[in-house]
């Protein structure tokens, strides 16, 4: 299996706990919001998401209940979210987050 397929499978495993989240694919930049970790960031793909929740894979050392920022790859205002679940699958890590201030409008865009 390829690395991309492995990442998608990891996200799919976590999405089983969020059956109402549709599959989606768009690029974001994930940034740690923890003081002293501001330089920790990476680009990734949101694989599942709608309204208040999103699921993506990451190599960042994120933990349960940690605050992060998501920035749409094409720009825009960062959105703060909280890690609510982690899934490890064959060396990969998927993260589910809940947006701190309601829904994330980008997810509603086609």
What are the residue ranges of the model-derived segments?
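Structured alpha-helical
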Residues: 1-110
């Amino acid at each position: 299996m390829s690395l991309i397929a492995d990442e998608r499978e990891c996200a799919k495993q976590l999405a089983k706990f969020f059956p109402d989240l549709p599959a989606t694919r768009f690029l974001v930049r994930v940034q740690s919001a923890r003081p002293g970790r501001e330089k920790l960031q990476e680009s990734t793909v949101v694989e599942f998401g709608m309204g208040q929740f999103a699921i993506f894979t990451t190599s960042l050392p994120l933990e349960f209940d940690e605050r992060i920022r998501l920035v749409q790859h094409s720009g825009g205002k960062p959105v703060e979210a909280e890690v609510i679940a982690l899934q490890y699958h064959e060396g990969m890590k998927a993260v589910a987050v809940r947006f701190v201030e309601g829904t994330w409008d980008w997810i509603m865009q086609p």
